[in-house]
């Protein structure tokens, strides 16, 4: 169904000017995409900005990648749920107990609870960078390992590159959501993402949600680019 397909795009808002962000967002329809707010914007503008986006009708992915002791992370995801966000994430490398307690903290919110997603391996990390951290696995092996841990802890899915999506779907099941950054529409610059695919390639590989930032936010006609992306994955 095209509507469901169109809601697979999560636009990464990376602005240091709140009005510029709102001017951009107001060009979009909540039926055509969801929005991702990360550390930069949240640090600048805080929960009030997130609530404003929600009031405009958008589902918001609060991308703060919580990573702390279990009690602190549980309180943080509770605060995110009270804010009304659609999705929130934590670092899988925080461990099983941290992830499990975060999921338990969302239980009282019932069907209003945000999806809880784990970050596995950042898309800017390659094998060389992992080795510098003392991890001897390849990026793909580490993603699979951490994704299995996240599922065991009860999480709803993971952030992963499209290259891992097919294997993750096969091993962890269709209901385990895969959120994929590093997506570049055909003809876009790769930027600082080392593991990239086009939207259609990522969906075909098994990704459920695609994070796209600069190729849309910095486009001359962002609405047209978004429409093209949505059409490409119908």
From Swiss-Prot:
CDD domains the UniProt entry points to: OMP_decarboxylase_like (cd04725)
Keyword terms: Decarboxylase, Lyase, Pyrimidine biosynthesis
Enzyme type, top EC level: lyase
Residues annotated as catalytic: 65 (proton donor)
GO cellular component, one term: cytosol
SMART domains: OMPdecase
One Gene Ontology MF term: orotidine-5'-phosphate decarboxylase activity
UniProt-listed PROSITE patterns: OMPDECASE
Protein name per its UniProtKB record: Orotidine 5'-phosphate decarboxylase
């Amino acid at each position: 169904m095209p509507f469901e397909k169109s809601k697979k795009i999560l636009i990464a808002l990376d602005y240091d000017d709140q009005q510029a962000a709102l001017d951009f967002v107001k060009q979009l329809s909540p039926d055509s995409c969801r929005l991702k707010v990360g550390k930069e914007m949240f640090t600048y503008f805080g929960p009030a900005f997130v609530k404003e986006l929600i009031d405009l009708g958008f589902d918001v992915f609060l991308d703060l990648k919580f990573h702390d002791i279990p009690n602190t992370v549980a309180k943080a995801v509770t605060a995110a749920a009270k804010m009304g966000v659609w999705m929130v994430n934590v670092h899988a490398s925080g461990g099983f107990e941290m992830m499990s307690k975060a999921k338990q903290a969302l239980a009282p919110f019932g069907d209003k609870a945000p999806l809880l997603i784990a970050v596995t391996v950042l898309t800017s990390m390659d094998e060389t960078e992992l080795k510098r951290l003392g991890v001897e696995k390849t990026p793909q092996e580490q993603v699979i390992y951490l994704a299995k841990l996240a599922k065991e802890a009860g999480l709803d899915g993971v952030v992963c590159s499209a290259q891992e999506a097919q294997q993750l779907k096969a091993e962890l099941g269709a209901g385990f959501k895969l959120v994929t950054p590093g997506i570049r529409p055909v003809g876009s610059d790769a930027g600082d993402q080392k593991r990239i695919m086009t939207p259609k390639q990522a969906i075909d590989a098994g990704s459920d949600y695609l994070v796209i930032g600069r190729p849309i936010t910095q486009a001359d006609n962002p609405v047209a680019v978004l429409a093209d992306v949505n059409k490409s994955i119908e």
